[in-house]
């Protein structure tokens, strides 16, 4: 039967509960245990699919097509276990399910209340389908004291009494701020946070304290005394030079030992952390460096590209080089020559996105990469802009554009329903729902034999990758584009939807309709990112 570890946060948000959960999961996994990680999000949205990247950051898509919190990306990268839609739930989804049941009459006329109906739904989600796992780690989003989080805290309080004694522990992630004028770390915010947690019936077993310096013995003693935890359970979570150094750092601080002790489990063997050590050695001692320009529209919010950043670092790990990122707002190129911004870089990546803002700048970035032989990686929207660039500047289709931006005489890119219905432009109503209208999750793609991408994937002819898009490249223009050198080297197995384009006579120019960054791991870098960084490394030696 699974044991449960609940991770809560206090004092301030954005302390890294997701990363802490992922690192602890990796440590338990390294000891031979089977782990599952889940995330409870207290916001009222059904999912983050329609939320602004500036507010929520990246939307992480699972194989089964769920749009989830970016923390699930950390879970996958650290444990290697693919997440599913059953690993993330929001208040909005819970209320939707409850109200659907109420309208259906499932509650037999009962008054629907937060306790017990909402809390029971949360508990049912937490314990569902956990057979075969030794530990289930459950992260509660937000901080203690947030009004929207109260039903979740009440549910995890109740669940300790529902399960056998000793099967549940609570870890509280908190902040120890350093006050320069006083010259000391302050424990009072943590004390108040734990007091708030205890007021709703939850006593933390372990305090995980974020800090930028060692915790003095006196402060550790004070935290243990006033927060009612063992002194050994006050764990120092120092800032690390890389997120992949966190598992080793947490082990050195005693987190996994303290977790096992809280469950009364004897720690017979230390965790096998050799591969983590090897990864960190490569990160700390690179044999070179490459600079990649990311030409996007959310560059002011790096969390919008979290998986992309990590996938590029994985490509660097595979090639033993440091990957430096040059963030460029694509709108800049609409009024300025891209050359001064891009001449010094070793590779250009145009990531996914939605909407017209900055689109012309991305097209100019693709043109610069094509004409100057700079490695180019276009992902989703980045592939579509590369196709439009080829249509305009190689095939002579001057009005080539996307129907996403409005009516166009030459719809190189449009809604999938448009092309599947014989190019009769059929558009979703502007008043319609945005949620649930995309191609989401893992889909297969057939690769052309002998193509560059086929070789990158290891000479395979079929792959499976995760998608998140409404628009597709129009296959009616496929032959004209191929006549001018843009090869459609990957298609859906039925030949209807373009998946990959490339230039054979370019050092490295690939556009993909899917999101390969979502499947990259530090120990298994995605082959496209490894190859892209390798091409950038070759470019760096030529410039």
From Swiss-Prot:
Organism field: Rhodopseudomonas palustris (strain HaA2)
Cysteine disulfide partners in this protein: none
Keywords tagged on the record: ATP-binding, Glutamine amidotransferase, Ligase, Magnesium, Metal-binding, Nucleotide-binding, Pyrimidine biosynthesis
Reactions performed catalytically: UTP + L-glutamine + ATP + H2O = CTP + L-glutamate + ADP + phosphate + 2 H(+); L-glutamine + H2O = L-glutamate + NH4(+); UTP + NH4(+) + ATP = CTP + ADP + phosphate + 2 H(+)
Residue positions binding Mg(2+): 71, 139
Domain Glutamine amidotransferase type-1: 291-542
Residues reported in the UniProt entry to bind ATP: 14-19, 71, 238-240
NCBIfam families named among the record's database cross-references: PRK05380.1 (NF003792), PyrG (TIGR00337)
Keyword Nucleotide-binding in record: yes
Name of the coding gene: pyrG
Annotated region described as Amidoligase domain, given as residue ranges: 1-265
An example Gene Ontology biological process: pyrimidine nucleobase biosynthetic process
SUPFAM superfamilies: Class I glutamine amidotransferase-like (SSF52317), P-loop containing nucleoside triphosphate hydrolases (SSF52540)
Regulation: Allosterically activated by GTP, when glutamine is the substrate; GTP has no effect on the reaction when ammonia is the substrate. The allosteric effector GTP functions by stabilizing the protein conformation that binds the tetrahedral intermediate(s) formed during glutamine hydrolysis. Inhibited by the product CTP, via allosteric rather than competitive inhibition.
Keyword Ion transport in annotation: no
Name of the protein in question: CTP synthase
Active site, UniProt feature: 380 (nucleophile), 515, 517
InterPro entries: Class_I_gatase-like (IPR029062), CTP_synthase (IPR004468), CTP_synthase_N (IPR017456), GATASE (IPR017926), GATase1_CTP_Synthase (IPR033828), P-loop_NTPase (IPR027417)
């Amino acid at each position: 039967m699974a044991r449960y570890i609940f991770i809560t946060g206090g004092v301030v948000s954005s302390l890294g509960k997701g990363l802490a959960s992922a690192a602890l999961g990796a440590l338990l996994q390294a000891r031979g245990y089977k782990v599952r990680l889940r995330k409870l999000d207290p916001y009222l949205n059904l999912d983050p699919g329609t939320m602004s990247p500036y507010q929520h950051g990246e939307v992480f898509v699972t194989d089964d097509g769920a749009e989830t919190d970016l923390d699930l990306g950390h879970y996958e990268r650290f444990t290697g276990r693919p997440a599913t839609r059953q690993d993330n739930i929001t208040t909005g989804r819970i209320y939707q399910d409850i109200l659907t049941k109420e309208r259906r009459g499932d509650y037999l006329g009962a008054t629907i209340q937060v306790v017990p109906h909402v809390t029971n739904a949360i508990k049912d989600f937490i314990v569902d389908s956990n057979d075969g796992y030794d530990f289930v780690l459950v992260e509660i989003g937000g901080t203690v004291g947030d009004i929207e989080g109260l039903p979740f805290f009440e549910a995890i309080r109740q669940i300790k009494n529902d399960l056998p004694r000793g099967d549940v522990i609570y870890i509280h992630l908190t902040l120890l701020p350093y006050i320069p004028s006083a010259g000391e770390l302050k424990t009072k915010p943590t004390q108040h946070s734990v007091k708030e947690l205890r007021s709703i019936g939850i006593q933390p077993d372990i305090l995980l304290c974020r800090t930028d310096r060692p915790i003095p013995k006196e402060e550790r003693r004070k935290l243990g005394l006033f927060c009612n935890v063992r002194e050994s359970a006050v764990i120092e979570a120092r800032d690390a030079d890389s997120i992949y150094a966190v598992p080793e750092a947490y082990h050195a601080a005693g987190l996994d030992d303290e977790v096992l002790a809280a469950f009364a489990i004897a720690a017979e063997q230390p965790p096998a952390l050799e591969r983590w050590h090897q990864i960190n050695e490569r990160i700390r001692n690179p044999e070179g460096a490459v600079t990649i320009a990311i030409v996007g529209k959310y560059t002011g919010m790096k969390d919008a590209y979290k998986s992309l950043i990590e996938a590029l670092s994985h490509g660097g790990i595979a090639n033993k080089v440091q990957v430096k990122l040059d963030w460029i707002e694509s709108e800049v190129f609409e009024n300025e020559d891209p050359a001064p911004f891009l001449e010094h870089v070793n590779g250009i990546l145009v990531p996914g996105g939605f909407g017209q803002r900055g689109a012309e700048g991305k097209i100019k970035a693709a043109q610069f990469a094509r004409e100057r032989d700079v490695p180019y990686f276009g992902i989703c929207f980045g592939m579509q802009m590369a196709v439009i660039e080829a249509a305009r500047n190689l095939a002579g289709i001057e009005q080539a554009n996307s129907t996403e931006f409005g009516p166009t005489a030459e719809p190189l890119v449009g809604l999938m329903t448009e092309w599947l219905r014989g190019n009769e432009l059929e558009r979703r109503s502007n008043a319609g729902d945005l949620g649930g209208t995309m191609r989401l999750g893992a889909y297969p793609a057939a690769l052309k034999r002998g193509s560059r991408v086929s070789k990158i994937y290891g000479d395979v002819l079929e792959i499976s990758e995760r998608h998140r898009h409404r628009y597709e490249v129009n296959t009616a223009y496929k032959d004209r584009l191929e006549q001018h050198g843009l090869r459609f080297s990957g298609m859906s197995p039925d030949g209807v939807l373009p998946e990959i384009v490339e230039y054979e006579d370019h050092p490295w120019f690939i556009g993909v309709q899917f999101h390969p960054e979502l499947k990259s791991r530090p120990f298994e870098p995605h082959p496209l990112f490894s190859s892209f960084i390798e091409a950038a490394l070759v470019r760096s030696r030529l410039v």
